[in-house]
Amino acid sequence: MKKIYDLWVRVSLIKKIGIGVVIGVMLGILAPDLTGFSILGKLFVGGLKAIAPLLVFALVSQAISHQKKGRQTNMTLIIVLYLFGTFASALVAVLTAYLFPLTLVLNTPVNTELSPPQGVAEVFQSLLLKLVDNPINALATANYIGVLSWAIIFGLALKAASQETKHLIKTAAEVTSQIVVWIINLAPIGIMSLVFTTISENGVGILSDYAFLILVLVGTMVFVALVVNPLIAVLITRQNPYPLVLRCLRESGLTAFFTRSSAANIPVNMQLCQKIGLSKDTYSVSIPLGATINMGGAAITINVLTLAAVHTFGIPIDFLTALLLSVVAAVSACGASGVAGGSLLLIPVACSLFGISNDLAMQVVGVGFIVGVIQDSCETALNSSTDVLFTAIAENAFWKRKKA
């Protein structure tokens, strides 16, 4: 037994997760009635979601309270990369929709419990109000905009605190980080359960009717991950980006794919940034911020499904309108974390540009929910892995400038 345990400890976490995925698929196909097994996945995701807000608050307040004057954090470049990356993803989605026009069968039931925002202004109003949310409520509800704003305020206030108080904050951050490590080490079991649940509940062939839509969505996201993002990285760093890109996809994107939660993946991303050797002053802020505004995957979903609806209804569209759609999708995607239902519920905002009624737009949303098992997984994997990628290339660019 000890030999098996020692062998398991020596195997890398990624290989363990791979083993968990294979076992989860086999159990989902061969023993789908083991419904009690799904609780392990819920516990794993719940644990990550529970600790993530506390981790963000502890690390950000600790980093700011200990920050010395003149220390570079590269946040300006990172935010520019987040916004540009989201717009680039939206533009690629428009071009993809032109190359591979989709026709939707809009006979899906509409979830009337969900109400989309009335426009981009409402999305950003919701986002701004989250800045001044009650700090306890922000932690309890995982409102990362609120958590970040209060963590920054607390960090600035703690600059004037005694060294003993600062040491206490640092210890709290270290303790929280250690708890995160323990939870992440349970990823193989949690992901095995999540895979089992997906296969046992949906089967392996339930999405065949929407195969082309899924192919276009996933293909666009893969293109952005393996072509567009590396191109951005090359322009910034002037070196081969693929070792870093593939590492981010492997160590961040893989867990995000199965948890389907950018919030749950924040601790995973922070641990990866630490392993890469990035500055804690930077990634403690950029990673939770990225989970909120870096939404390239969401922009792709909004544009592909909106243009599929436009094609279905035979609405003519010129290039300037498509460009405007890219801007609206990018802006809306940045506020996706502030909307119940995420990127799918922002589709009616984009559809309104073409005069598509809310009832019909909500049927498009219904199609999105059907393919959501795959769409949401790929979208989260792209969004979350890009947070680490852009943080890393911004820091790399800073050190290159400093050496020059």
Curated annotation (Swiss-Prot):
Origin: domain of life: Bacteria
GO MF annotation: an example: amino acid transmembrane transporter activity
Keyword Transport carried by entry: yes
Topology versus the membrane: Multi-pass membrane protein
Transmembrane helix keyword on record: yes
Described purpose of this protein according to its UniProt entry: Involved in the import of serine and threonine into the cell, with the concomitant import of sodium (symport system).
InterPro entries on file: Na-dicarboxylate_symporter, Na:dicarbo_symporter_sf, Ser_Thr_transp_SstT
Subcellular location, record wording: Cell membrane
GO BP, sorted A to Z: serine transport; threonine transport
UniProt-recorded name of the protein: Serine/threonine transporter SstT
Similarity comment: Belongs to the dicarboxylate/amino acid:cation symporter (DAACS) (TC 2.A.23) family.
HAMAP family: Ser_Thr_transp_SstT (MF_01582)
Alphabetical UniProt keywords: Amino-acid transport, Cell membrane, Membrane, Symport, Transmembrane, Transmembrane helix, Transport
A cellular component term, taken from the record's GO annotations: plasma membrane
Spans through the membrane: 17-37, 39-59, 75-95, 138-158, 179-199, 212-232, 287-307, 313-333
Catalyzed reaction equations: L-serine(in) + Na(+)(in) = L-serine(out) + Na(+)(out); L-threonine(in) + Na(+)(in) = L-threonine(out) + Na(+)(out)
NCBIfam families: PRK13628.1
